[in-house]
């Protein structure tokens, strides 16, 4: 796993090893991550990564959020509870030298409380597949003020999702057994 483009381009991220089977640690592949960011930078969606506030729910290794930082995002908040995930996120932040731009929240994304900071305009949601955790996490993020009105949400899942009434599905991409859903606020 590596950072694909931007200020941290080419940096090899910490090896996942055996991962964390209990937490279903399943990093987004370099190929899928590159494709997602090509879509984001292609101008189809009304999002500017440069200066963005990024929220990475079920952050895993933090690679999606760190890729956004590498490409000009101003801030990243990673949310995860897995011990192995949190260790990998910390290692990857150090590899990228991004400590001052990243906040780590050790909390369950399906139990988010109210956001005390500014809302986020780029959200990555990559819950364990086939656990139906994404719906709960996104509902709490919406209710808790985590998601800005102009936000773009990229939700990676291994099954069909239930799109909350407050959101609109604007695109779907399929990558093997996973799908990336692109959503905005309605």
Q: What are these language model-derived features?
A:
Residues 1-186:
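Class I S-adenosyl-L-methionine-dependent methyltransferase catalytic core
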């Amino acid at each position: 796993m590596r950072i694909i483009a931007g200020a941290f381009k080419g940096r090899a991220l910490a090896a996942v090893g055996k991962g964390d089977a209990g937490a279903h640690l399943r990093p987004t592949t370099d190929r899928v991550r590159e494709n997602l960011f090509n879509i984001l930078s292609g101008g189809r969606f009304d999002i500017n990564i440069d200066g963005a506030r990024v929220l990475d729910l079920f952050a895993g290794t933090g690679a999606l959020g760190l890729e956004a930082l590498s490409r000009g995002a101003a801030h990243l908040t990673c949310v995860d509870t897995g011990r192995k995930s949190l260790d990998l996120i910390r290692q990857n932040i150090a590899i990228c030298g991004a400590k001052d731009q990243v906040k780590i929240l050790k909390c369950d994304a399906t139990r988010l409380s109210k956001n005390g900071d500014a809302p986020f305009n780029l959200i990555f949601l990559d819950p364990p597949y086939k656990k139906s955790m994404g719906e709960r996490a996104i509902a709490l993020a919406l209710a808790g003020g985590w998601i800005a009105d102009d936000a773009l949400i990229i939700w990676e899942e291994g099954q069909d999702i239930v799109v909350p009434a407050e959101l609109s599905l604007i695109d779907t991409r399929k990558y093997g057994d996973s799908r990336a859903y692109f959503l905005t606020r309605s």
